[in-house]
Amino acid sequence: MPKQIIIAEQHQIAAVFSEDQIQELVVATGHHQIGDIYLGVVENVLPGIDAAFVNIGDPERNGFIHVTDLGPLRLKRTAAAITELLAPQQKVLVQVMKEPTGTKGPRLTGNITLPGRYVVLMPYGRGVNLSRRIKSESERNRLRALAILIKPAGMGLLVRTEAEGKPEEAIIEDLEVLQKQWEAIQQEAQSTRAPALLNRDDDFIQRVLRDMYGADVNRIVVDSSTGLKRVKQYLQNWSGGQTPQGLLIDHHRDRSPILEYFRINAAIREALKPRVDLPSGGYIIIEPTEALTVIDVNSGSFTRSATARETVLWTNCEAATEIARQLRLRNIAGVIVVDFIDMESRRDQLQVLEHFNKALRADKARPQIAQLTELGLVELTRKRQGQNIYELFGDTCPACGGLGHTVRLPGETENRLPTPAAEVPERFVSLPTREPRLPTARTTEPRETYDGFGEAFENDSDLGALNLINHPSYQELNDNNKRRARTRRSRIGINGTNGKDEQRITANPLAFISESDLDLDGDVELSAPPELPTPNLGKSGWIERAERTKVIKTEPVKPVVEPPEIRTVEMTPEEQDIFALMGISPLIKLEQEVKNPKSVIINIVQPGQTPTIPTEITPEPVAKVTPSVEVNTPKVKLESKSVSVAATEPIKLTETMEESEVNAASTANRRRRRRSSASDSDTGEDS
């Protein structure tokens, strides 16, 4: 079948197309590539596994070489142990046999090979070998005789499949190029300090054409004009100075990148997925593991056959063809196990195996089918040639670490998910406060973190914003609820606490004080929340808390009170009613500004009336509240003095104040009547 070769030299990627499908990828990326020749230094010799580690310049991983791959050293002493062949700090000439994978370093060999277009030179090899794909016996005899004549002394030679039918001059010229290359490597090895890279196929286009070009290729597309010239030059040198007939060489000129235009990137994305759909409706699942690669075949939605036997046979044959292509595309190597759909007929099993073996012949890695097991599994092996597609284009998932799933253990769901604000109990939420403010209680010790809630209390400055008198929790309590609250609080003893009350800790430590527990004239004892029990590994299982209470010392804070400002406003009775009804302050009628509108005394007089300015302000007493909390917790003492209402709250003219003035006037009239009646009665008795 005709093939096309797409070369993206900029990205060092080439693809081989056949029947509008990518059959194979060639990627030349990575620090160590197959065929690289290094001058290495032996680091460690391990006689237990007959191997050694060689430093080839990689600071992270050393190369691995087995005793069977030592090459010229082993040829001299065949039966010797590796400790007699290698020693630490010894210089060795090695070639990369397998690229590094995962935590493993590159596999090295001492059997150096230099591949050419028609022959492969083996400097430390012996004899002459021919490719198995050359079928003609007369051609094999011709090439064998030619190789014996031109083979350098003391070296080996391998004749490739491309040499079939080629003239002798082209084969000899190819061998001479390889001999010059080997001489340059030897000279550089003598003058270079180890470890060092001595040789690499830097010409990506030459490498692709050497390994992939054949008589069945009818089109080559390159992404650069210089690459186009080099392709023509290489092909002319290999064809006696003439461009091969029937071959189209193109330069990609489209605006879209060459990898996107020919859907190479899309094919790579699909190849990284485990599922591959078949044309008939079935599909296969490819799962690589550390030990082997498992491939499962499923019929899927294929129901076009008349019988179940035909459906199974057709699906297995389609799967065999697709599996052979996926092995080349993904470059899967090692042990491979294929689970075809169960077939009862032995004849059908042999037919599928024959079809599978025929599809694998186009693979240059020479996969070998081992056997068909009793469970219906097909076992085969494939030689490793470079990194697979998962190592080249795949990265480990940061979420699962490559497992393919994340772990969710019992009881961890609640800890991972954030708690919605609507589900937080009301007793754990800080409630808003209103004016007036109490003196700030500042403690000398830092607040503790309660492990039961996983959060710490806020700083002490927030205590100054508490309004205990107007707190909603105290407004909702009637007399019965107050008695129940005192009863529950009294259950908290000195040596222990109730389990329920111990868990009901309020986020605000002042929330235990009720309206009747506050004494602004004297000391105020504030109860802190009880501590949670801590587990102990002793005999009793729980330990008594050594220190159950902590005394928090506070210093009294004296508020700075400024005398109120007195302002006189002239207003008619009608204006007073309108301002009171609409809630408008009389201060808007003043032309001068007021320093503090919240601390001012407004003297309202009628127009033309002489204002009477008060000379002294008598502070009103504040209701006293005596604390009666019996909780054995840290206490905070606060000292406060009564503050004039005029200094903390602005005077507001409302309808309520007018009614209070009317009530006061009526009360004074009744007192006068009582006095007058009492005086009349006394006069009557005297008479």
From Swiss-Prot:
Region named Disordered: 650-687
Record Pfam families: RNase_E_G
Enzyme Commission numbers on file: 3.1.26.12
Residue window of motif C4 Arg-rich motif, necessary and sufficient to confer PNPase binding on another protein: 670-678
Keywords, alphabetical: Cytoplasm, Endonuclease, Hydrolase, Magnesium, Metal-binding, Nuclease, RNA-binding, rRNA processing, rRNA-binding, tRNA processing, tRNA-binding, Zinc
Domain of life: Bacteria
GO cellular component labels: cytoplasm
Cofactor names: Mg(2+); Zn(2+)
GO terms for biological process, alphabetical: rRNA processing; tRNA processing
Binding site for Zn(2+): C397, C400
Annotated ranges, domain S1 motif: 35-117
Entry keyword annotation includes Signal: no
Subcellular location: Cytoplasm
GO MF annotation list: endonuclease activity; metal ion binding; RNA nuclease activity; rRNA binding; tRNA binding
Gene3D superfamilies: Nucleic acid-binding proteins
InterPro entries xref list: NA-bd_OB-fold, RNA-bd_AU-1/RNase_E/G, RNase_E/G, S1_domain
Reactions performed catalytically: Endonucleolytic cleavage of single-stranded RNA in A- and U-rich regions
RNA-binding in keyword set: yes
Binding site for Mg(2+): D296, D339
Details of cofactor binding: Binds 1 Mg(2+) ion per subunit.
Record note on quaternary structure: May form homodimers or higher order multimers. Interacts with polynucleotide phosphorylase (PNPase, pnp) via the C4 Arg-rich motif (residues 670-678). A homotetramer formed by a dimer of dimers.
Family classification: Belongs to the RNase E/G family.
Function: Endoribonuclease that plays a central role in rRNA and tRNA processing and mRNA decay. Has been shown to act on 9S rRNA (the precursor of 5S rRNA).
PANTHER family: RIBONUCLEASE, RIBONUCLEASE G
Name of the featured protein: Ribonuclease E
Species the sequence originates in: Nostoc sp. (strain PCC 7120 / SAG 25.82 / UTEX 2576)
Taxonomic lineage from the root: Bacteria, Bacillati, Cyanobacteriota, Cyanophyceae, Nostocales
